[in-house]
């Protein structure tokens, strides 16, 4: 079966070598004294969620009544005060849902305004008002397309006919709402969209909106909403901002007007367009959670909110339970949030790169040390503290063949309590990289800790291990050790056991002397460090010892409830690793 385009002779051929023959650049307006580039965002806009209307109509499987109600409750819990609840004149499901919201006590919070969209046609306008009647606060959202393309190709209307359509619709809305006795129990608002605004002649858009305003007669206390959509994103964000500033500075009675922005994301810059549009005079933004909507989506309200939040400006929306919000959104929309989605994707707080991991690890440590006196968040690669959205730092660093020592060390410290010396981080980081290369996949923290315990003989003994020992003094600065050592051969049989003795200025040097005497093994101890793991009765000691054998460094690790035993185990761990390396 042929597609619509094929049936019309529109067969795919590929990209043109000279696209200028087919596509023309968007022409902006001349605004030589534009003011928006000199401004900064210092407060949140009014937000409207259109998930239940613009978002829902774009879903392959639109939400049913139960899903809509679940989503509405989610939006209220986040803090949205304006919610577009549907297109009741076009859908009986939407009509029934709006009536259910209004007729069920307590579903709509007193401070929440619901709105519904309607074309500028009398039967549809009246049906929409019928759906909204009885709500405490309701906005009728009227629209008609005004751009040349839609006037000439879609509707075949002149400018005057387009203007008359907007005026007629506004008269009907006014008569049936704030001027109607049966509608007095509702606080009515009015929103008008010159649809396809960004492709409409700016002066014509102003002319239409002035006429609509004259019908509604707004006040400063109850302004009319002029929603200025980039119905299809056709230009760079600065061009949209110019259009908004031109409209905002030229509409009369500006104090009686709320300028609302409604960018779509066809060029991938809806967020930027919304932010620049705010600088240019926008008071309100319409969009969807995670950018749902027609084609490439509406502007993403989550990204906009966190962009403000991470600049120290409260968005007046609460996304603390972001994982739960994502889960409900995915359940209702049946579309997954992309793993790279700003702020919300399951990989946005994740670093695989070694250099990134090292910087994050150091940044988190520095922040933890200074946050009591300087709480300002400054951590490389993380514009948002994961704790602010109930996420854990443990999820930040994940390990594959691209990872480095810093990430591996961070995971071992946060999950196992092991604070590796830098040189040991380098050694084990290389081991992890080789192991991940062999496996060809990301390693879990369980796999990393298992590899660490196996490599350094913490789970099972290496070739040499201490079975028992006694220490005695041989003068004020000398220790004698008598140590029972198990020696494991190549075959997995019972290890042989010998008693060795040595003298040194401490337990570790005494063990080194004993190994040299018994086995003719000559090596030095390089770096040594230790720290406690845990606290209280269950505290253990972790010891790290660098063995220098034939000018080669081998690290050993020991963990024990006794500090001395941990150090001796670390020496044997290093010696076992050295003997294994040189036996190959």
Swiss-Prot record:
Keywords: Amino-acid biosynthesis, Branched-chain amino acid biosynthesis, Leucine biosynthesis, Metal-binding, Transferase. Residues 45-323 form the Pyruvate carboxyltransferase domain. It is an enzyme of class 2 (transferase). It comes from the Eukaryota. Its EC number is 2.3.3.13. Pfam families: HMGL-like, IPMS_D2, LeuA_dimer. It catalyses: 3-methyl-2-oxobutanoate + acetyl-CoA + H2O = (2S)-2-isopropylmalate + CoA + H(+). The keyword Amino-acid biosynthesis applies. GO terms for molecular function: 2-isopropylmalate synthase activity; metal ion binding. GO terms for biological process: L-leucine biosynthetic process. The keyword Repeat does not apply. One of its GO terms (cellular component) is mitochondrion. A divalent metal cation binds at residues 54, 262, 264, 298. SMART domains: LeuA_dimer. Pathway: Amino-acid biosynthesis; L-leucine biosynthesis; L-leucine from 3-methyl-2-oxobutanoate: step 1/4. Its cofactor is a divalent metal cation. Homodimer. Catalyzes the condensation of the acetyl group of acetyl-CoA with 3-methyl-2-oxobutanoate (2-oxoisovalerate) to form 3-carboxy-3-hydroxy-4-methylpentanoate (2-isopropylmalate). Belongs to the alpha-IPM synthase/homocitrate synthase family. LeuA type 2 subfamily. This is 2-isopropylmalate synthase. It comes from Schizosaccharomyces pombe (strain 972 / ATCC 24843).
């Amino acid at each position: 079966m042929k597609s619509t385009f094929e049936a019309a002779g529109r067969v795919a051929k590929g990209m043109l070598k000279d696209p200028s023959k087919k596509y023309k650049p968007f022409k902006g307006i001349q605004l030589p004294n534009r003011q928006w580039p000199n401004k900064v965002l210092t407060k949140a806009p009014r937000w409207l969620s259109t998930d239940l209307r613009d978002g829902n109509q774009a879903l392959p499987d639109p939400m049913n009544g139960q899903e809509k109600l679940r989503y509405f409750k989610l939006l209220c819990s986040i803090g949205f005060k304006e919610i577009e609840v549907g297109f009741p004149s076009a859908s009986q499901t939407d009509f029934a849902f709006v009536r259910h919201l209004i007729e069920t006590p307590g579903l709509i919070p007193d401070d929440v305004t619901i709105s519904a969209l309607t074309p500028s046609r009398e039967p549809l306008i009246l049906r929409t008002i019928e759906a909204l009647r009885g709500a405490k606060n309701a906005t009728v959202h009227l629209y008609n397309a005004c751009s040349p393309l839609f006037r000439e190709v879609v509707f075949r209307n002149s400018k005057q006919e387009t203007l008359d359509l907007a005026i007629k619709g506004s008269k009907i809305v006014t008569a049936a709402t704030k001027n109607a006795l049966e509608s007095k129990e509702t606080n009515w608002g009015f929103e008008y969209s010159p649809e396809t605004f960004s492709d409409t002649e700016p002066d014509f858009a102003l002319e239409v909106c002035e006429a609509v305003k004259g019908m509604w007669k707004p006040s400063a206390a109850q302004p009319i909403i002029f929603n200025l959509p980039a119905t299809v994103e056709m230009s760079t964000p600065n061009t949209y901002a110019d259009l908004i500033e031109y409209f905002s500075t030229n509409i009369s009675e500006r104090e009686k007007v709320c300028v609302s922005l409604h960018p779509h994301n066809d060029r991938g810059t809806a967020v930027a367009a919304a932010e620049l549009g705010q600088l240019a005079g926008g008071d309100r933004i319409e969009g969807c959670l995670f950018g749902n909507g027609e084609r490439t989506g509406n502007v993403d309200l989550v990204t906009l909110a966190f962009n403000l939040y991470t600049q120290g400006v409260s968005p007046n929306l609460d996304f603390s339970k972001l994982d739960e919000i994502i889960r409900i959104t995915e359940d209702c929309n049946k579309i997954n949030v992309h793993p790279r989605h700003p702020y919300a994707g399951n990989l946005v707080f994740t670093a695989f790169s070694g250099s990134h991991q090292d910087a994050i690890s150091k940044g988190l440590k520095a922040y933890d040390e200074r946050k009591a006196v300087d709480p300002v968040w400054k951590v490389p690669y993380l514009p948002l503290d994961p704790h602010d959205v109930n996420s854990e730092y443990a999820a930040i660093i994940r390990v594959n063949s691209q990872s480095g020592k810093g990430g591996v060390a961070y995971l071992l410290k946060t999950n196992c309590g092991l604070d590796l010396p830098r040189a040991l981080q380098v050694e084990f980081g290389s081991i992890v990289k080789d192991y991940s290369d062999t496996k060809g996949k990301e390693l879990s923290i369980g796999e990393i800790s298992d590899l660490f315990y196996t490599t350094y003989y913490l789970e099972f003994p290496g070739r040499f291990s201490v079975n028992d020992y006694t220490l005695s003094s041989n003068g004020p600065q000398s220790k004698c050790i008598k140590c029972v050592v198990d020696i494991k051969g190549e075959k997995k049989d019972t290890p042989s056991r010998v008693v060795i003795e040595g003298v040194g200025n401490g337990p570790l040097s005494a063990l080194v002397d004993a190994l040299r005497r018994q086995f003719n093994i000559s090596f030095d101890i390089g770096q040594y460090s230790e720290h406690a793991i845990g606290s209280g009765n269950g505290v253990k000691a972790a010891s790290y010892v660098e063995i220098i054998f034939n000018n080669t460094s081998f690290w050993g690790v020991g963990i024990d409830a006794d500090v001395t035993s941990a150090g001796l185990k670390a020496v044997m761990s290093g010696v076992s690793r050295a003997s294994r390396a040189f036996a190959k």
